Amino acid sequence: KENGIDISKPNFISNASRDTVVEERFDEGSKYKNRMDDPEFFGEFLDWGFSNFPAERYGLFFLDHGGSWTGFGGDEQDGLHGSNPIKPRAFRKEINRAFNKYKINKFDFVNFFACLMGSVEVLDAFDGLCDVLYANPEICYLWKYNHEARARFIGHLLNNPDIDNISLANYEVDNWMPK
């Protein structure tokens, strides 16, 4: 158990509440290791998720800075200031590798809560990897609402596990901005 959550069960997140804090720190001096802006580490994260939490449906959620064809993210936890975003085609390569390894066809959704990720280059890179891709082609001036909006989206998904992809997409569009 971590912070009162039995993480050995595939549905451990459903036992969480808004007050649950799950925190794991990287070792000091881990610069250049365990970086979520490293495509191979992202691939290892997918392996970890698929092997430890088998499911009938999968979604992938990204929250960070987007840069269209230049990439997404940039790990800032180690003082490198997020200077190495993952390119769209690098995502595709690692996702396809993991899908082949775990015999998964595609994600139900991929959600980029980030600027500029609705470009044709990103859409092309994620083509066929998901049923629904959420991505904004413009700047998102929602920085102070990121966590609130994401908590609502995840809460809605947890409260409606059988929701179809189009209904979930409609919910996301209707609740993008705070009311």
Residue ranges and their predicted role:
Residues 1-61, 66, 70-95, 99:
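Divalent cation-coordinating acidic motifs and surrounding scaffolds
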